[in-house]
Amino acid sequence: MKNYLWNMFTTIKNGQMAKKRVVIGPRKNICESFLKILWNEGFISGYRISSQNPSNVEIFLKYTRTGVPVISSLKFLSKPSQRIHYSSKQIWKLDSSKTFVIFSTNQGLKSINECKKDRVGGEPLIIIN
């Protein structure tokens, strides 16, 4: 599961460093749910299934008017060697105004705001600034 996400994060990071508008990533359910969260929160312009190769997804990166990437940093928080889990009570203590966190829950990938709304705990995967 996470190998696909790591590949997608690297693709997005490298694409933004190279100032690309479109990058291509693997089309997996976990990757599509991650892209849906990024799109709903305004971190990417959009995504679509590649017309040339249906097993890939085209990701449209978003930049400010000055050309600065909207996503300044993507970091993995929970790693295979060090698992971190938060209960629903611990999630309420996190400050969601400064950073954006995506959690892996028993209901799939959810943003920190969705976890607070649904009162669900989980494993924090990604921190986006």
Give the positions of each predicted feature.
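Core subunits and conserved enzymes of cellular information-processing
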Residues: M1-N129
